Design a protein with these regions (language model features):
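Beta-strand-centric surfaces of beta-sandwich/beta-rich domains
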Residues: 105-120, 148-347, 352-487, 495-498
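Compositionally biased, intrinsically disordered/low-complexity regions enriched for serine, proline
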Residues: 13-14, 22, 33, 56, ...
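Sequence-pattern detector for short linear motifs
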Residues: 7-8, 30, 232, 498
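Aromatic- and Gly/Pro-enriched helix-to-coil junctions and flexible linker segments
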Residues: 22-191, 199, 203-207, 275-281
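Bacterial N-terminal signal peptides
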Residues: 8-18
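N-terminal secretory signal peptides that target proteins for export/translocation
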Residues: 1-4
Length: 499
C-alpha cells in the first residue's frame, strides 16, 4: 500500500461547537458543587399530569433498574410492582437526577453533552426519561391503569449472567472471610480451564457467588460481596501443573465489584490456549461487616467460532499513575494529569476510569497539533467501578503521534461520602485508603492500511463533509502526496527488508 500522509496542522478542521447544553449543570472536581439534572416535562412534549407508573415508569425500570432491583437481584430493594416502587418514589427521583456522580442510579456515569455518547450496554436514562420520572413523582406518583403495564420480564432464578450462559465457566476456590476482620491480599492459586484446544475469547464476565441470602436486607455493595477486586492472568500449565509456562502468560482485565463484563469486538479477542489455567495472583478480599461469608469468583467465557483468528493487536489503556501521586487532605477539585504519545495508529475500545475513594471524575482527551478533543468525561463512584465500551462506529480512531491526555479529579473533603478520613495525606497504593489514577480501558493497534480502512468506513457513515465525528477527527483531513523524504524512507525500508 502506498504511503499516505495527513497534514500535521489541523487548522483546516473546524472544531465542533460546544455540545454542553445550558440545561446541564456544570461539572467539576468537587462533590460540594454537584447539582442534579432537573427537566421540565413540557420541554419534551410530555403532559406531566398524564404520567403514570403503569404506562411510563414501569418500562424505564425494566430496562435500566430491574436487572438488580428485583427479588434475588442483588440490590437492597425490589422495583418491580407498583406497591414496591411507590414508597421509594422520592428516592428514585433524587438518585436518578444525580445521573453522572457518585450515588447515582443507575450506575452509568458518562456525562451527557460532552464527547462520544454511543456505548454498548448503555442502560443510562435519557433527558426525557428523567423528565418523566420527575413529573411522575411531583404529581404524586400515580399508578394509572394496570392494563397499560408492559409484560413482566422473566428474570433468572439466581443472579444469572448478564450476557447469557457462557461457553465455559471456570470456578475459583471458595474463600471465607470473618464478619469483621482485616482485609486479605494475595495469591489464591491456579485454576485449570480444562480446554483441549486454543480458543479466542469474545467476552469474559466475572461474578461472585457466595452464601449471603439473596433476600438479605443489605444497603451497601460491601455488605453483599467479599471480593473487592482480582488481578489475574492466564497461560499454559507446565508439565507438573504447578505453574504457567514462561512466555505464554497474558493479563486479563481486572475484576472489580460492580464492574460490567468485558466484550472484545470482532477483529480482536483474547487467546485462552489449550491446557491453560487462570492464575488468581492478586486478590483483595474484605469482611462484610455483619456475617461470616464464604464465596468464590466464577469466570464466564464466551468464544468466537472455532478457527477464528484476530485481525488486530491488543494494547492497554491510556496511562495514568498508580504510584507517584500526592493527594492533599481536605481539598476538593484536585487535578491529576497523565500524557502518553501514541507510537501506533490506535482504536480505543473502552474507557475505564480507575480512581480510589477520593475519585470524583475522569476525562479523556486527544491532543493533535494545537487542538484538544475531549473524547469523554465520566463521573466516578468507588462503589461502582465501570468500563464504558464504545459502539464500533463511535470508537476513537487516533493517528500515531496523538497525545492521549487523561485528567483525574479528586475530592478529600467531608462532602465526599466515600472518604473515611479527610485529615490525612495519601499517596499511591493498592488499598482503597491509598490512591490510584489510571485508565484501565482497552485499545488496539492498527496498521496504516487498517487505519485508512477504518476511517473510510466512518466517512461512509457521514452524510457529507459537514458531518462531524469527534472519535475520528482525522476523517476529513485532506491527504497530500508523499514527499521526496517519504519516498526515500520507503526505499530504505524496502532495502532493509530485502537484506
Amino acid at each position: 500500500m502506498s504511503a499516505r500522509r495527513f497534514l500535521g496542522s489541523m487548522a483546516i478542521l473546524l472544531l465542533p461547537p460546544t455540545a454542553l447544553s445550558a440545561q446541564y449543570p456544570v461539572r467539576d472536581g468537587t462533590v460540594a458543587n454537584m447539582e442534579p439534572y432537573v427537566f421540565a416535562a413540557a420541554d419534551f412534549g410530555i403532559d406531566a399530569s398524564s404520567v403514570t407508573f403503569s404506562k411510563d415508569i414501569a418500562p424505564i425500570l425494566q430496562r435500566s433498574c430491574q436487572s438488580c432491583h428485583r427479588e434475588g437481584g442483588g440490590a437492597p430493594m425490589s422495583l418491580v410492582a407498583y406497591n414496591e416502587v411507590r414508597r421509594w418514589a422520592p428516592r428514585i427521583k433524587e438518585r436518578t437526577a444525580i445521573r453522572d456522580r457518585m450515588g447515582a442510579m443507575p450506575p452509568f456515569f458518562v456525562e451527557p453533552g460532552i464527547g462520544i455518547q454511543d456505548f454498548k450496554n448503555d442502560y443510562s436514562l435519557s433527558d426525557g426519561e428523567l423528565a418523566t420520572i420527575q413529573a411522575w413523582v411531583d404529581n404524586g406518583a400515580p399508578e394509572g391503569d394496570r392494563a397499560d403495564l408492559p409484560p413482566a420480564v422473566e428474570w433468572p432464578d439466581d443472579r444469572g449472567w448478564v450476557l447469557g450462559e457462557p461457553d465455559l465457566v471456570v470456578q475459583g476456590p471458595d474463600m471465607t472471610m470473618p464478619a469483621v476482620g482485616p482485609d486479605r491480599w494475595g495469591d489464591i492459586g491456579l485454576v485449570p480451564t480444562g480446554l483441549t484446544q486454543d480458543r479466542y475469547v469474545m467476552s469474559v464476565e466475572v461474578r461472585e457467588v457466595n452464601d449471603i441470602p439473596t433476600d438479605a436486607d443489605i444497603t451497601t455493595v460491601g455488605g453483599r460481596y467479599i471480593f473487592h477486586h482480582m488481578t489475574y492472568t492466564s497461560g499454559q500449565l507446565n508439565d507438573e501443573g504447578s505453574g504457567l509456562v514462561e512466555g505464554t502468560t497474558q493479563g486479563w482485565p481486572i475484576h472489580e465489584v460492580g464492574r460490567n463484563p468485558d466484550i472484545f469486538p470482532e477483529g480482536l479477542g483474547m487467546l485462552l490456549p489449550a491446557n491453560s489455567a487462570l492464575s488468581l495472583r492478586a486478590s483483595h478480599l474484605h469482611s462484610t461487616g455483619w456475617r461470616e461469608t464464604t464465596g468464590r469468583l466464577e469466570f464466564g467465557f464466551r468464544f468466537f467460532p472455532e478457527g477464528y483468528e484476530p485481525e488486530y493487536r491488543r494494547a492497554g489503556g491510556s496511562g495514568g499513575n498508580g504510584i507517584d501521586i500526592d493527594v492533599r487532605p481536605n481539598e476538593g477539585g484536585q487535578e491529576f494529569h497523565s500524557y502518553r504519545v501514541l507510537e501506533d495508529h490506535t482504536k480505543i475500545i473502552a474507557f475505564e476510569p480507575h480512581l480510589h475513594a477520593p475519585g470524583v471524575r475522569m476525562c479523556l482527551e486527544a491532543i493533535w497539533g494545537t487542538n484538544r478533543f475531549t473524547l469523554n468525561c465520566v463521573g466516578y463512584d468507588h462503589n461502582w467501578v465501570k468500563q464504558y465500551i464504545y459502539e464500533d462506529h463511535a470508537a476513537p480512531l487516533l493517528p500515531k503521534g496523538t497525545i492521549v491526555h487523561i485528567v483525574g479529579f479528586l475530592d478529600t473533603t467531608a462532602e465526599n461520602p466515600n472518604l473515611a478520613d479527610t485529615r490525612n495525606w495519601a499517596g499511591g497504593g493498592r488499598r482503597s485508603v491509598a490512591n490510584m489514577f489510571i485508565d484501565l480501558g482497552q485499545s488496539v493497534r492498527l496498521t496504516e492500511e487498517q487505519f485508512q480502512t477504518e476511517m473510510a468506513e466512518r466517512r461512509a457513515r457521514m452524510k457529507d463533509r459537514n458531518a462531524y465525528d469527534i472519535g475520528c477527527f482525522m476523517c476529513w483531513a485532506p491527504e497530500i502526496a508523499p514527499t521526496a523524504a517519504d519516498a526515500d524512507a520507503q526505499t530504505q525500508a524496502a532495502r532493509g527488508q530485502n537484506q
